[in-house]
A protein has these predicted regions:
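A conserved ligand/cofactor-binding region detector
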Residues: 1-262
Length: 262
């Protein structure tokens, strides 16, 4: 109440919003009603040093046409429909030339123009919670995380593996998991506080081509933390695999062995 007296304009809209307060409950009810299980214990709760789980679930199959149209639209006096029809008639060779010319001058710290935001990628990541907290700092994207849980196992840091301390690491994590399941029977929300940063969290995220340049440059370098570097390398491999032509002029600090461009 004192806040309302001192800074009334800052907290003018701080009242409870019933729609947002009830949205999560409605979604949980829908999942259960249509028999989508909300949680099951993992059969093997140790993910160890395995490869990150990354899936490219959707990508823009008209991306080349959309990007070329966006690049030509800005300084044209034609409607978008007219630009689109002409871009289709240009053929793939001309469209690729337009894209290449638009990225040829990119420096190591430059971002592509806004036109590159018209192409989207949707990924599903299974990241350890520490990596997830780093990942969500990138704001030019949408992300939909599932609740924190121990059901997807945990990531053992490579340095722990190299030191031969896997057993000690597991012995440290297991009690937290045991208590998690007990607390969850009483309060699923409270149980989430028992999830360690090593435990995996599943998230679906969508980001555009422009953001992918920034994300891949920053998070695939050798200086990046391993827990986010590995999944970002895999995400980049998947994106480049379906649309290599978009990444021809992407400037990386460290190129992976599979990089398709000279």
């Amino acid at each position: 109440e004192q806040g309302r007296l001192i800074t009334p304009t800052l907290i003018k809209y701080a009242d409870r919003v019933d729609y947002f307060a009830g949205a999560s409950t409605i979604q949980l009810d829908q999942a259960r009603r249509y028999r989508f299980p909300d949680e099951e214990p993992a059969a093997d709760a140790v993910s160890g040093a395995s490869a990150p789980e990354v899936k490219l679930v959707h990508w823009d199959r008209k991306g080349e046409e959309k990007l070329a149209a966006a690049l030509l639209y800005r300084h044209s006096n034609l409607s978008y429909d007219d630009v689109w029809e002409r871009v289709i008639d240009l053929g793939p060779g001309s469209r690729q030339a337009i894209i290449d010319e638009s990225t040829a001058g990119l420096g190591a710290h430059d971002a592509p123009t806004r036109e590159f935001e018209v192409v989207d990628y949707t990924f599903e990541f299974t990241l350890d919670y520490g990596a997830y907290r780093e990942f969500k700092r990138h704001r030019m994207m949408s992300y939909l995380p599932q609740p924190l849980t121990v059901a997807h196992g945990y990531k053992i840091p490579p340095v722990v593996v190299q030191a031969g301390l896997e057993s000690e690491f597991e012995q440290t994590v297991r009690p937290a998991e045991d208590v998690y399941w007990k607390v969850r029977e009483v309060s699923p929300l409270a149980a989430q506080y028992l999830v360690t940063h090593a435990h995996n969290r599943r998230v679906v995220t969508k980001f555009n081509l422009r953001e992918s340049y920034h994300l891949f440059k920053m998070r695939t370098s050798e200086e990046a933390h391993f827990s986010i570097r590995e999944p970002m390398l895999e995400a980049m491999r998947l994106a480049v695999g379906v649309q290599p032509q978009f990444f021809r002029n992407l400037k990386l600090r460290n190129y992976p062995d599979w990089w398709p461009h000279p």
